[in-house]
Design a protein with these regions (language model features):
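N-terminal secretory targeting signals
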Residues: 1-28, 136-139
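Secreted/periplasmic proteins that engage bacterial cell-wall peptidoglycan
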Residues: 32-75
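Extracellular/periplasmic catalytic domains that process cell-envelope and extracellular macromolecules
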Residues: 22-26, 48, 103-105
Length: 139
């Protein structure tokens, strides 16, 4: 006896999320990250973490970026004070993302927030949702 295929009710509705395709530039992503991280405040400081500047950079991030630069045989280095400088913070962000081969805005945002294994962390999914909301308000 052949199994019966289930039949769909005539008014069966499938709810699909709306699909919106938009290219996000690095500048747009960085602006969104700055708004999420510090509300666009270059002087922001979160004392419980030691996160400083527009991109809320930790001392460990500065050390990681300097380690990357040493491996690349670059003479360039960043100091903890450079976290307060927006342009230098953006440079550190770009060095970090390039080193870890982060390509998509989601990869960049989640790993910026959660480290090189950020894509594996649930907390960075919530962070990415905040960044996406910020990106939507920018456009």
């Amino acid at each position: 006896m052949a199994a019966k295929c289930p039949t769909l009710k005539p008014n069966y509705v499938v709810n699909l999320p709306s699909i919106k395709v938009k290219t996000i530039t690095d500048k747009e992503l960085i602006n969104a990250l700055i708004n999420v991280e510090s509300a666009n405040n270059d002087n922001a400081y979160r004392s419980c973490e030691g996160a400083a500047g527009a991109l809320q950079i930790l001392c460990t991030m500065v050390r990681d970026v300097n380690r990357i630069l040493r491996r690349q045989k670059s003479n360039q280095r960043y100091t903890y004070e450079d976290r307060w400088d927006r342009q230098k913070s953006i440079e550190m962000f770009n060095i970090y993302c390039n080193h870890y081969n982060l390509v998509t805005p989601e990869e960049k945002a989640r790993c910026w927030n959660g480290g090189p294994r950020g894509l594996q962390k649930l907390s960075t999914k919530r962070y990415w949702e905040k960044v996406k909301k910020q990106l939507a308000t920018q456009n």
